Swiss-Prot record:
Transferase is among the record's keywords: no
Entry keyword annotation includes Lyase: yes
Enzyme class: lyase
GO process terms (BP): L-histidine biosynthetic process
EC number(s) given by UniProt: 4.2.1.19
HAMAP family per record: HisB (MF_00076)
Native source organism of the sequence: Trichoderma harzianum
GO MF, any single term: imidazoleglycerol-phosphate dehydratase activity
PANTHER family per the UniProt record, alphabetical: IMIDAZOLEGLYCEROL-PHOSPHATE DEHYDRATASE, IMIDAZOLEGLYCEROL-PHOSPHATE DEHYDRATASE HIS7
Organism placement in taxonomy: Eukaryota, Fungi, Dikarya, Ascomycota, Pezizomycotina
Name of the protein in question: Imidazoleglycerol-phosphate dehydratase
Amino acid sequence: MASPLPVRAAALSRDTNETSIQIALSIDGGELPQDADPRLLEASSAHASQTSKSQVISINTGIGFLDHMLHALAKHAGWSMALNCKGDLHIDDHHTAEDCCIAVGTTFAKALGALTGVARFGYAYAPLDEALSRAVVDLSNRPYTVVDLGLKREKLGELSCEMIPHCLQSFAQAARITLHVDCLRGDNDHHRAESAFKALAVAVRWYD
């Protein structure tokens, strides 16, 4: 009988002067890790959530559009992920958006664990209507990011458009990966941003 595959999951609590974050992530979907903070699955606080046989996703950052992007990332990467953040949104969105993506990247790296048997390089294209994005990833342990989304609006919902590339940079830095993300075409900034997160999601779907 074949040995069961190792569980690729991790949970993290991250507290700073600006944010308090709890996150749990299972790269292969399914149930969240047993040491996940129970507060993560409080349905009343989840702004972007779904539950199925293969995935559990519950995201509450306090920023609706960021919830939407992280939900898209988890869904299309095949992850189960729960994240809750209380941040200093009375100041602006910077600390919350940055710290949430640092937490996602850190937890992803922890859950992925040893890279033996995992493809080092991943890439994907993802469309959303008229928008098309490309993501290329290298599990290099040398964090580096190039992001070109061509966003023109000041904000999408309550998330500053300048923070969207920074979110991708923060994820890559914490995950210790090299990441290139480009939106190749598109008229709608919502579509451009979402297709970028979906391309990243598909690019990081590594399996043993």
